[in-house]
Structure formats: structure tokens, C-alpha cells
UniProtKB/Swiss-Prot annotation:
Keywords: Cell inner membrane, Cell membrane, Cytoplasm, GTP-binding, Membrane, Nucleotide-binding, Ribosome biogenesis, RNA-binding, rRNA-binding
Family: Belongs to the TRAFAC class TrmE-Era-EngA-EngB-Septin-like GTPase superfamily. Era GTPase family.
Signal peptide: none
CDD domains in the cross-refs: Era, KH-II_Era
Protein name: GTPase Era
Domain KH type-2 per the UniProt entry, residue ranges: 206-283
Binding of GTP, residues: 15-22, 62-66, 124-127
Role played: An essential GTPase that binds both GDP and GTP, with rapid nucleotide exchange. Plays a role in 16S rRNA processing and 30S ribosomal subunit biogenesis and possibly also in cell cycle regulation and energy metabolism.
Region (G3): 62-65
Species this chain originates from: Klebsiella pneumoniae (strain 342)
InterPro entries assigned to the protein according to its UniProt record, in alphabetical order: G_ERA_dom, GTP-bd, GTPase_Era-like, KH_dom-like_a/b, KH_dom_type_2, KH_sf_prok-type, P-loop_NTPase, Small_GTP-bd
């Protein structure tokens, strides 16, 4: 009896900031793994999400959004991470937003024209397009930009046509042995995922108040005698005023962030979590490449 063939390959999800790349990854995996918020630049590392279905294993790389501004060290590193993801994959999903087309979209497209991998164009947030008559001419405009493998209008938020993307991915995976066991959904450590969950809550609850000068270090991540985890998170900001903002009036803001982060961690780790958070000022970290390296921003470039 012949052994069943297996298929496996890397798939990069690329696009300018805030077009819904992380939401799409979470939908493709069937669970939350990459952080999502309405602010641009929420994804700072390349997250590998793994989806195994029978003989097919797709390994998704969720890149930071490519964008024009490279003034700060952190933005330069994020662009480098996104560009390097494009180079070594079997397939690329290029995510754009509705009928919007910007200079940043153009920049991503130019990088993709040089890439060897076939590109699926996912036109996200089509449910938000007010005038549906604009959609068809825009899709025709997109089709003329490059020879895409396929163009799929989707809503990552509601899941519309995400199964179509998944089917195209499966069809184009090369024959290969699986890189990961079938129950793996990410190659990232639980410690890393804990820091991402806290960072998402910071983005969500502080909104536009807080600039991108915030990051999270997990100082302690241990199993306790109750079969759960004790986690200590350190939130780093650049200025004293930002520290007050994170803590909130009588500690209300950081308490909310902690409660919501703990819920998500318990769902993800399937165990009770005791979480403690502190806030510390570390000025200039987003401008300093050495500081970024020490915080793990460059470990995967």
C-alpha cells in the first residue's frame, strides 16, 4: 500500500499597515494567534502560524506592515522583517483594503513584482465599501497591476471567502514532509505569546492616546503547584507621562488591561493564570537598535 502524499509550504501574508493581515491569519488558523487592533503597526514580529489539515500543512508568516516612513530604528527593522518574509516562501497573500490604494500599497506591489513566489490578492473589508459600483472597476484596476494567481474579495473580520483563500493555498503547496506535528499552531513560545496578548490589550484600551513607544517584557513565566502559570509582565514606555497613562486613575486602566490579558492567556494556555503587571520608563528604546535587539525585535530577521 502506498503511503499518502503530504504537502507543506511557507505562505507570507503581506500588505501595508492595518489592512487586516493579522485578522486574516487568525481566521485561517481558526484561532487567535497574531495581535489585532485598529492601530497600524501592531504586528512587530514575524509570527508563524501553522494550519494542518489532513495531508496539507500551511505555515503562515504574518509580517509587519511595510510602510514608507523609516525614520525610527523600530520602523526600519519592521520593514526589514516584512521584506525578508517575502523572499523565502512558496506563496504570498497580498492584503489590500477595499477600494483604497495608497503609496504604501504601491511599494509592497513593487517588492512583490521582484519576488519569485506566486501572489494571491486578498481584497479585504469589501463589506465596508459603501458604493458597491466602485468595486468592480477597482478590481479590474488591481488585476492590471500584476499577474496575480487569483484575486479574492474577502472580509477577514466576518470570515467571508477566507475558505476560498485556504483552498487556493492548499492547491499550491508543494509535495513535502510536514515541518511541524499536526497539533502545533505556532512555533512561538508561550512567553512570547503572553507578551503579545498584553501588548494587544495596551493598544486596545489606550487607543490613540499611547504612541508606539510601548513594549512588553515577560520577566517571569513559571508553572505553579496549582497546574497554572505565574506570569510577571513589565510594560516599558518612553516617558513618565506615558506611564501615568498606562496606569490610569487609581490604577483603573492597568487593572482592566491585566484582567482582559489574563482571560486571553487562560483561553490560549488552557490553564489558570496569575498575572502581575508593572510599568517602567525606559527612554529612547524605539530609537536604539541595541535596545531593540535586547527586547527580541531582531531575533528573527
Amino acid at each position: 500500500m502506498s503511503e499518502e502524499k503530504s504537502y507543506c509550504g511557507f505562505v507570507a501574508i503581506v500588505g501595508r499597515p492595518n489592512v487586516g493581515k493579522s485578522t486574516l491569519l487568525n481566521k485561517l488558523l481558526g484561532q487567535k494567534i497574531s495581535i489585532t487592533s485598529r492601530k497600524a503597526q501592531t504586528t512587530r514580529h514575524r509570527i508563524v502560524g501553522i494550519h494542518t489539515e489532513g495531508p496539507y500543512q500551511a505555515i503562515y508568516v504574518d509580517t509587519p506592515g511595510l510602510h514608507m516612513e523609516e525614520k525610527r530604528a523600530i520602523n526600519r527593522l519592521m520593514n526589514k522583517a516584512a521584506s525578508s518574509s517575502i523572499g523565502d516562501v512558496e506563496l504570498v497573500i497580498f492584503v489590500v483594503e477595499g477600494t483604497r490604494w495608497t503609496q504604501d500599497d504601491e511599494m509592497v506591489l513593487n517588492k512583490l513584482r521582484d519576488a519569485k513566489a506566486p501572489v494571491i490578492l486578498a481584497v479585504n473589508k469589501v463589506d465596508n465599501v459603501q458604493d458597491k459600483a466602485e468595486l468592480l472597476p477597482h478590481l479590474q484596476f488591481l488585476a492590471s497591476q500584476m499577474n496575480f494567481l487569483d484575486i479574492v474579495p474577502i472580509s477577514a473580520e466576518t470570515g467571508t471567502n477566507v475558505d476560498t483563500i485556504a483552498a487556493i493555498v492548499r492547491k499550491h503547496l508543494p509535495e513535502a514532509i510536514h515541518h511541524f506535528p499536526e497539533d502545533y499552531i505556532t512555533d512561538r513560545s508561550q512567553r512570547f505569546m503572553a507578551s503579545e496578548i498584553i501588548r494587544e490589550k495596551l493598544m486596545r484600551f489606550l487607543g490613540a492616546e499611547l504612541p508606539y513607544s510601548v513594549t512588553v517584557e515577560i520577566e517571569r513565566f513559571v508553572t505553579n503547584e496549582r497546574g497554572g502559570y505565574d506570569i510577571n509582565g513589565l510594560i516599558l514606555v518612553e516617558r513618565e507621562g506615558q506611564k501615568k497613562m498606562v496606569i490610569g486613575n487609581k490604577g483603573a486602566k492597568i487593572k482592566t488591561i491585566g484582567i482582559e490579558a489574563r482571560k486571553d492567556m487562560q483561553d490560549m494556555f488552557e490553564a489558570p493564570v496569575h498575572l502581575e503587571l508593572w510599568v517602567k520608563v525606559k527612554s529612547g528604546w524605539a530609537d536604539d537598535e541595541r535596545a531593540l535587539r535586547s527586547l527580541g525585535y531582531v531575533d528573527d530577521l
